[in-house]
A protein has these predicted regions:
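Sec-dependent N-terminal signal peptides
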Residues: 3-16
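Short, flexible, solvent-exposed loop/turn segments with mixed acidic/basic and small polar residues
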Residues: 14-15, 49-56, 103-107
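Short N-terminal or domain-adjacent regulatory/targeting segments
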Residues: 77-110
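Short phosphate-binding/catalytic loops that engage adenosine nucleotides
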Residues: 49, 79, 138
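A short, charged/proline- and glycine-enriched loop
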Residues: 18-19, 107-114
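Helical hinge/lid and interdomain linker segments adjacent to catalytic or ligand-binding clefts
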Residues: 22-32, 63-72, 115, 119-189
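N-terminal, post-signal-peptide region of Sec/Tat-exported proteins
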Residues: 34-73
């Protein structure tokens, strides 16, 4: 009988630990599709699943729940990922929580509603932010003066304003192109 207990004990603890998370690495060596990786994280949040953002761990990696749907979507989008066991996740989280490390695990719970302050006539390639969000497959809404003046900012969790609005970069652009026919035409529209 004692041998049976020993055998059961060995069998129980020799079974491989099942994976519980998908690690989306964000370091330059491991991830070829950084922007798409942000997109899959947003997509996961839209599915009302929580994500852990591992700040300063392998470039700010993400931990997503281990589901077949997420793995398939990562493959479709060309995103590098690693399936990790519970013990490996515990090891990573212990490292991150160490006071000697400049790292943090932040739980993301909701896909933010994103607005980009930009003229309506712009194409995604006219604006680096909208181009990145479009490529990453992160949904956003373009708003401009009319939406701001009619209190529609309340509909969004995140508003992106371009840095040139504050640094004078638009002034350089205006000085260079204010007399260009295409610029004059766009301003009239």
């Amino acid at each position: 009988m004692r041998h049976l207990y020993i055998l059961l004990f060995i069998l129980l603890f020799s079974v491989p630990v099942s994976a519980s998370y998908i690690l989306i690495p964000m370091d330059a060596e491991s991830q070829a599709e950084h922007l798409k990786a942000y997109g899959i994280t947003y997509w996961t949040l839209e599915k009302q699943l929580k994500v852990k953002w591992l700040l300063n761990y392998r470039g700010g990696s993400f931990l997503l729940p281990d589901t077949e749907e997420i793995k398939k979507e990562c493959q479709i989008r060309g995103i590098s990922f690693e399936v990790l066991s519970n013990s490996k996740i515990e090891e990573i989280l212990n490292l991150i929580s160490s006071p000697s490390q400049n790292m943090e695990a932040v739980v993301l719970e909701k896909a933010p509603r994103i607005a980009v302050y930009s003229p309506k006539g712009n194409q995604p390639w006219d604006d680096a932010v909208t181009m990145v969000l479009t490529y990453a497959e992160i949904p956003y809404t373009v708003i401009y003066d009319e939406e701001v003046l009619t209190d529609q900012l309340l509909l969004f969790d995140w508003l992106h304003l371009h840095h040139e609005d504050f640094t004078g970069q638009y002034g350089k652009f205006y000085r260079a192109y204010r007399a260009a026919p295409w610029y004059i035409k766009n301003k009239k529209e």
